[in-house]
Regions:
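Transmembrane alpha-helical insertion/packing segments
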Residues: 1-63
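Alpha-helical transmembrane segments of polytopic membrane proteins
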Residues: 40-50, 79-83, 121, 143-152
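Hydrophobic alpha-helical transmembrane segments
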Residues: 118-157
Length: 195
């Protein structure tokens, strides 16, 4: 049972990491022309936040789809959609505390402080890059919307996706799953049988 929870939590954390890496790699390239303005960062973060929501929803939907099978020993329950987001939220909380610590703690060794700040701030920004456009300034002050997105997107959309998968609601799943998961191409035999 614990092994199953660790496995599905790892899937959700992997979904978070994949979207952030995708956002970090392609987001600035796609939106390079408009990133010179603050509005450009908002547009990029809004688009990447939608992609993040779709990916998390689809992953949770797929997990629930496996849990509701009659032969599965893992039973689906509605709160599992929230539980599977907990490890990702804990990592986000730890990185947030380290990020805050890097701004307000002074080391005796200046080089050590600079290395620590560089590593912590870049890891934190990479971990939450999809929402980076909603962060206020480089001086450490951060808008409330940024924190809401960092801490609410994963549990809300994993809950909705798991709930929809548990009840077999296909609201947008066929569309979203084509964006997230590779679907096998139909063979000529299948195409002829459909006609």
């Amino acid at each position: 049972m614990v092994k199953h929870y660790l496995k599905v939590c790892l899937k959700m954390t992997s979904a978070h990491v994949v979207v952030q890496l995708f956002s970090l790699a392609l987001g600035p390239l796609v939106f390079y022309i408009i990133l010179g303005s603050r509005t450009g960062w908002y547009i990029m973060s809004a688009a990447l936040s939608v992609a993040y929501a779709i990916w998390v929803y689809s992953t949770a939907y797929k997990i629930a789809g496996k849990d509701i099978k009659s032969y599965s020993q893992h039973k689906a329950y509605i709160a599992k959609g929230l539980v599977i987001a907990v490890p990702t939220l804990l990592i986000t909380l730890i990185l947030t505390l380290l990020y805050d610590f890097s701004f307000y703690h002074q080391f005796t060794d200046y080089d050590m402080q600079m290395r620590f700040e560089f590593i912590v701030r870049n890891v934190f920004m990479g971990w939450n890059f999809s929402f980076e456009g909603f962060r206020s300034a480089a001086d450490g002050t951060v808008r409330m919307l940024y924190w809401v997105l960092c801490y609410a997107m994963m549990p809300v959309f994993s809950f909705l996706g798991y709930w929809a998968g548990m009840n077999r609601y296909e609201f947008g799943y066929n569309f979203f799953s084509k964006l997230v998961y590779k679907t096998p191409a139909k063979t000529d035999k299948e195409n002829k049988s459909l006609k």
